[in-house]
Amino acid sequence: MNLYLLLLVIATSSWQFVAGLECPVECTCDKKGLVVDCSSSGLTRIPKNISRNVRSLVIRNNRIHKLKRSDLEGFNQLETLVLTHNKIKIIEENVLDHLPELKRLSLAHNELVYIPPLCSDSRPLASLNLKRNHIQFIDEQVLRYFPDLTQLDFSHNRIQSLRTKLFDNLPALSHAHLHSNPWHCDCRASKVKALLQKVKWEKKVYCTNPVELRHQALDEVDDSALTCARPAEESWTGEEIKLTCAKNSSSKLVVWMYENVEVDSSSLDGYEIHDTVITVPRKTNVNFMTCTYDFDHIPHHRRLRQSQHQGNGSPQFTYKPRDNSFREGSEVKVNCEVMGNPKPTINWYHNGKRFISSRKRQLGLSNNVLRIYPFLEEDSGRYTCEAVNSVGKVRHAFSLDLISSVPPNIYEGPQSVSQNLGGSVVFVCKANGNPVPDYTWSFDGSTIGHIKGRFMVSDDGTELRISNIEKKDEGYYSCMAGNPVGAMSADAKLTVIGGETRKAAAPQIDEELLRAIAQKARQNVENAVEKTRKQLTQDKVTNTNDLKRLFRFSTPKQAVELSKAREIYEESVRLVREHVEKGLILNVDELHPKNVSYESVLHVTHVQALMGLSGCHTGQYKNPCTDTCFHHRYRSFDGQCNNKNKPMTGVSLMPLRRLLKPVYENGFNTPVGWEKGRLYNGYPLPNVREVSRQLVATENITPHSKLSSMVMQWGQFVDHDLTHTVTALSRHSYATGAFCNRTCENLDPCFNIPLSPNDPRVKSGSAKYPCIEFERSAAVCGSGETSLVFNRVTYREQMNALTSFLDASNVYGSNEVQAQELRDTYNNNGMLRFDITSEAGKEYLPFEKDSNMDCRRNFSEENPIRCFLAGDLRANEQLALAATHTIFIREHNRIAKKLKSMNGNWDGEIIYHETRKIVGAMMQHITYKHWMPIIFGGQAQMNKFVGTYQGYDPDVDASVTNAFATAAFRFGHTIINPSLFRLGNDFMPIKEGHIALHKAFFTPELVLTQGGVDPLLRGLFASPLKHPMPTQLLNMELIEKLFMKGHEVSLDLAVMNIQRSRDHGLPSYTEYRKFCNLPVPVQWEDMKGYIKDDMIIQKLRGLYGVPQNIDLWVGGIVEEKLENGLFGPTFACIIGEQFRKIRDGDRFWYEKDGVFTPEQLREIKKITLARLFCDNGDNIDRIQKDVFMYPGMDKENYGTCQETEMMNLRAWSKCCDNVCPTMLDRILRSRHRGSRLHGCNQNGIWRPEGAKWIPQNEICTECVCQGSRVWCSTKEDCSDNRSPF
């Protein structure tokens, strides 16, 4: 036995050794050697030691220059060959003779000029891709031996004409892409036109020559216009006739035609050709003889037209764009061409508003070409191309509309059947939709491949056939039809007659009930949202509370739709419970996702169906990060492409990260405290209003002896750069439609806080309604990095609308559209937009003009103004915050002007991105070097919790955590003063005096009418911070007067914080102490080590019963603070973890090698907030060097601005002349291919955009997810060089 085992080990090792030799070191291979990928390996030839059994060979992105027959010898089973993105210039004739089974060939993105015959006998080739080469000539025999060819791509080459017999004998051809070639539309083009009328194509084929047909679509040209020339001269010599063809100076080889076929392929015999002359037998019928030619040089049509223009003249259009429609997410290219002398300048307008070149809307060829990607709803509308010179001006308007896509609708679904053992059955599933849906079949939640044993799915996916039925085949079969805008599922049950009886199934929920439930859920949510929207139209916004609700509709539309989809999904699940006898009741100690299961009620196929019906398959657009130059240098606005390995890390509109798994009452979505009277660890959770009143509220405050109020304000500014949790859009219950604050029932999205009879608001009679209104945070379907079609019900997650990086997104915005709204588009100077300036000539934030947001608190006020517009929607929340935002728009514009003066060759795009990069570095430096050591109580304690910077780590997830955003970083509420100080130049109160906090909310007019930003800034750096004492936590302005308006129930910030943490499913304070490796209290006596005040412990005990019930935010703010710090160890742990990951996981961190030059970094490290105030205040001349430290009230304690160090921008002089091609106004502009976050569903497996794979049991096929569709051929549907095709 031992000898046998030894021989077995030796044999196995030997096999592994031999197998290893069959996979070259430059390649990756599957275990059987059937799939070999040698991409991006620097190869100059095809490796010799590849297994000859290989079925799929990918050698993309290498340096191969020539393809020889000998390179492919022996690959008798090869079905897919991908050689894209090489340097191939030559391929040998009949190169495919050694590949008898080849079905897919891609030679796209090479340097081929001539294509010779590819094989000498018949081959089963189905797909041929020659896209993006330099092809001018294609031999007539190239396609002769491919009767099975279905897909052909000759696009983006230099083809002027094709041989007339090239397309003969191609009975299976269904797709041909011939666009983006300089076609000569002569008699030869009639065969191309005929082909286009038979097959499907991607884009229209346009004529380049002759001039009279230029820019006309070939399929629209009349056949009579597709002609070749009659011979110019005829002469007879004996038995011969000489014919001469006229030829112009730009033409090259003349082509002679006989009966509209090239003479060398025609029935004509005995001819001789000498340049422009052909000699034919005298008996030839010369009436059938014509000639044509191709051109040596094809001048770009724009330059050609301009060369025809003589003398001075006003602009004239030579090509006008036409009205057109495009699908959502597609790339749009529009040409607008003019001539005139002097050369006209072209300007572009969208819905009457001028725009300049940007990442979203790129202008090329001196603004002649407009490219938009991705084309979304906000891009549709009326566009105007305007051409201006000193002689005159012309304008042309046209419309670009969005083609509405239609989600799938299954009109013929599978039917439940019974069948005997050994029999067979066919399930049918057919759906309408636009684009055409793809189909995925599953059995009891497990995906069925196209060919899987006894299971077979038809080629179009509409039929599932099961043969030789066994008892184990009994169960539910589900069909999912999906396209980029939605999905729909239908299922049926197979009952097998005979054999052992299967376990009784759970109560049934059929497809009809699911569809009705989803429709009712959508109606409930949509009605509730619409009611709220109507109530908050501009003429009904009468107070700041309404204003905050209206802000919800100003968040990006994408965020609105993502959160709405999840709400519909959850409402659907709630309605399902109403139809099921068995509810879901779990013990408190079972509140953990892995224990949950709505599957006890909902089958996995039903979960998938509800996800599709609710819209939970959609997601945010995903950037493939192919513009390596730009993404190496600059951040994207939404955070994508920061982490090259995980490009969606830290991106806006993504779920908050979890430190601990959430705790929901039902394990799915309902917060703890949702079910009234429920006990937790033997005690009911306290009413959060009572926690606020008894424990958190304080009428007395103690000023901090060392720190200024700027500590608080910078903290809020940083928070608004990192976190913004989107709230529910509706104030109405989805289930009943009741107004949220009219009832204290917990009905989504309402999670209101009842007021007790002894509440001061009730006793005083000021409470108009019985509870404080609270709407839950909007939920998000999923992250998109894995599957959005979950195999089980997933717990509720909340969305961060901002990027998680410290990147000045509160200045510039967290998406492309928002960023463009903030830019000055009328001048190409890289500056931010402003509308008015102060008396000192310095900019104020621009006014919000294009939405219903309005900051008028009292409509009877004189000169009411609209909201200020900034990168964060909350810029108007209070006056000091608006002043801080103002400083940063001024700083951006100050730097932009200096960079422009030093670098006259820079355009606005370069100036903007370089300035944005500098301002982002300023925020990072001030936060980490000046502010954070203060809040942690010193550099040593900061290093303990945050650590020192060791360089960028791509494995770090910088995403903001739910605990940080919802609880820990809200420690800042304990250091807010009840008033905003406003100090004049003499450091005395201005004549209007200080302002109570509740009067400072959403009042931007006071910035303009009461002294500008200077009094507010002095009030921050020259007033003391509120000391966060455990017995003095939140001042009464925040407890009783938050967003107060006379007759309404004002909010309570402590209540909001505690209720929000429950809404988000945050575990208790003790669980986070355990996470942080801190002592965990079991009894109340255990807490005396870190809560020194016995009275506080007694209050906690009276409210919570046991330490295990304490809410995280409450426990965190009453903890004993770190020495000289502003919070205790639990919050220090959570905040430290977050700021460490924000820094270490940021590829653009300002201290990372290569982000800035050493000289630039030295200058950035000189930056202080004091210097920013000096440079950008209206008249700030005295200030302390460290604005976070409070020197006292005496003006003499403040130094002069001359004493603060300045940053020298000379380090940026000519630093960036070598800019990325995508930032230049040239024809060389990358096409920023993106996609939708939801990716592709293939065989039930969800794959992210850009993923590539070999389907199981289909070795000959190689697939890529592109544009939310699965492409399983060598046809290239985009130029993204990550594609395997």
Curated annotation (Swiss-Prot):
Disulfide bonds join 336-385, 429-479, 625-641, 740-750, 744-771, 1076-1133, 1174-1201. Heme b binds at residues 719, 877, 973. This is Peroxidasin homolog pxn-1. One of its GO terms (molecular function) is heme binding. Its cofactor is Ca(2+); heme b. The record marks 874 as: Transition state stabilizer. Glycans are attached at residues 49, 248, 595, 741, 858. It is found in: Secreted, Extracellular space, Extracellular matrix. Residues 508-550 form a coiled coil. PROSITE patterns: IG_LIKE, PEROXIDASE_3. Ca(2+) binds at residues 721, 803, 805, 807, 809. Expressed in the ventral nerve cord, the dorsal nerve cord, head neurons, GABAergic and cholinergic neurons, body wall muscles, vulval muscles, uterine muscles, intestine, the hypodermis and in coelomocytes. Transmembrane segments: none annotated. LRR repeats lie at residues 27-49, 50-72, 73-96, 97-120, 122-143, 145-168, 204-227, 998-1022, 1049-1073, 1168-1189. Binds 1 Ca(2+) ion per subunit.
